[in-house]
Amino acid sequence: MANEVIEKAKDNMKKSIAVFQKELGGIRAGVANASLLEGIKVDYYGVPTPLTQMSSVSIPEARVLMVTPYDKSSLDDIEHAILASDLGITPANDGTVIRIVIPQLTGERRQEIAKQVGKLAEKGKIAVRNVRRDAMDTLKRQEKNGDITEDEQRSLEKQVQKVTDDATKEIDKLADQKSQEITQG
């Protein structure tokens, strides 16, 4: 039962890291990436709909995204949703598709994005620490109920701490890689 606590903590920390990686994928580094548009919701007949569910996104050139809506009547709504996002990109609507040229990043914009990566990393670490706290609370409860001894509790808490440290290092490593990718262009 105690090993289940460790395994559950590992699993939940891996999920937290996966969420962090997905969020990092949405941060642009001066090249076209379809995941850049994943978080955008379009008001489609009064229902907020993910852009990726109502259009196909292709990359015809290194710094160009092309959005082709399945329903041409939603073209203007898609354009407005992209403009309303805080991605710093401007869509060009030609009546059938929307082209988005990803601008070169300025030094100032690179620093802003690097700060955004830092905030995401902190959010990921908080999620990992919450998993750690839950695991520690479970171990304390088990010791209090007599399911495990005090020595077992201490040993398991050390294991949870090691898993937490490893997850935190992984998040730091991913954040550093993304920051370098952004600042070096």
Swiss-Prot record:
Region named Disordered: 138-185
One record GO biological process: translational termination
Entry-linked Gene3D superfamilies: 3.30.1360.40, Ribosome-recycling factor (1.10.132.20)
Key word Transmembrane helix present: no
Keyword field: Cytoplasm, Protein biosynthesis
Compartment annotation: Cytoplasm
Xref: CDD domains: RRF
Alphabetized Pfam families for the sequence: RRF (PF01765)
Positions of disulphide bridges: none
Record-linked InterPro entries: Ribosome_recyc_fac, Ribosome_recyc_fac_dom, RRF_sf
GO molecular-function terms, A-Z: ribosomal large subunit binding
Basic and acidic residues bias locations: 138-179
Transmembrane segments: none
Xref: SUPFAM superfamilies: Ribosome recycling factor, RRF
Protein's job: Responsible for the release of ribosomes from messenger RNA at the termination of protein biosynthesis. May increase the efficiency of translation by recycling ribosomes from one round of translation to another.
Entry similarity comment: Belongs to the RRF family.
HAMAP family noted in UniProt: RRF
Full protein name: Ribosome-recycling factor
